[in-house]
A protein has these predicted regions:
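C-terminal alpha-helical interaction appendages
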Residues: 1-76
Length: 76
């Protein structure tokens, strides 16, 4: 496997963990959690690999999402 493929697989697994933990923590459906995550600035930062944020623990990333983008929770 090349490095780009490994990074893509890692990112997909990270997104799954973020969405699952967000749904569990906020007691919302997986669909709602997906909508929140994929409409967040955090998702964009992770996708672009900005600041190495994608290497933080998924639980920390969920806390960052909840603290920095609370307006997304109003949508669910």
């Amino acid at each position: 496997m090349n490095e780009d493929l490994l990074e893509k697989v890692y990112q997909e697994n990270l997104e799954e963990r973020i969405i699952s933990f967000l749904a569990e923590k906020e007691r919302i459906s997986l669909e709602e959690a997906m909508d929140i995550y994929y409409n967040s600035k955090l998702a964009t930062m992770i996708h672009k690999g900005e600041y190495g944020i994608q290497y933080l623990d998924y639980k920390v990333l969920v806390e960052i999402l909840l603290e920095t983008e609370p307006e997304l929770m109003q949508r669910s």
